[in-house]
Amino acid sequence: MRFEFDAAKSAANKAKHGIDFVEAQTLWLDPDRIELPARPTNEPRFLLVGQITQALWTATVTYRHEETIRLISVRRARENEKAEYVSGR
């Protein structure tokens, strides 16, 4: 599995949400993480909800090629996403 992202967007995400895209990659270490469809755009996007330390985070991602995950944004999980995470465990 390989990650790609825009470095400037990662820095902006850190300033806005308190997490950059390098830190966000640890979401994939959560064995209970879930994936939900994101709102349709011009490319298929997904929401990955998982835990980092004691907080739930949501990453918006798209898949490129076979093993590449492109991080688009990361933020704290919303209440409905938290409920989905808990029910999926």
Which residues make up each language-model segment?
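Ribonuclease/tRNase effector modules and their secretory precursors
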Residues: 1-89
